[in-house]
Amino acid sequence: FGGFFGSRLMSNIREDKGYTYGIHSYFQNHVHASAWMISTEAGRDVCAATITEVIKEMELLRNELVDMEELNLVRNYMIGSLLGDLDGPFQLIGRWKNYVLNGLDENYFYKSIETIKSVTPQELQRLANTYLQPDDFYELVVI
């Protein structure tokens, strides 16, 4: 959605609209709960328009199937990111610490890779309809 340069948010809000230099989305995972964050720096004059565009992108995911070209691009990015997290002893121990703190076993990594490889556009749309409910989100704007 917004984790890399070719993402939907970057394409729309940076490249098409020019509202910001960068916009990102990521999960903030904790032991008992997680939060999905979207962050950017945009001018005061385009702040409301930026939020509107983020909501439009959520609606697109809820109402239209992701095409296979985009899905494969995101799959490759996600698998590359997971593998990059294993590049060195500090990254490895950080990943294992996360597994231990969250009660996950050693197969979690392999299950994650398999899920990324096998998820379908229909499953993504179902998940978007379950979790991307704009009325359930909080907006924090700092000026």
Where are these regions (language model features)?
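Short, hydrophobic/aromatic alpha-helical segments in well-folded domains
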Residues: 8-9, 127
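His/Glu-based metal-binding/catalytic segments typifying zinc-dependent metallopeptidases
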Residues: 1-7
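M16 family metallopeptidases and their MPP-like homologs
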Residues: 10-63, 68-119, 135-143
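Low-complexity, intrinsically disordered Gly/Pro/Thr-rich segments
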Residues: 120-129
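Extracellular/periplasmic catalytic domains that process cell-envelope and extracellular macromolecules
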Residues: 132
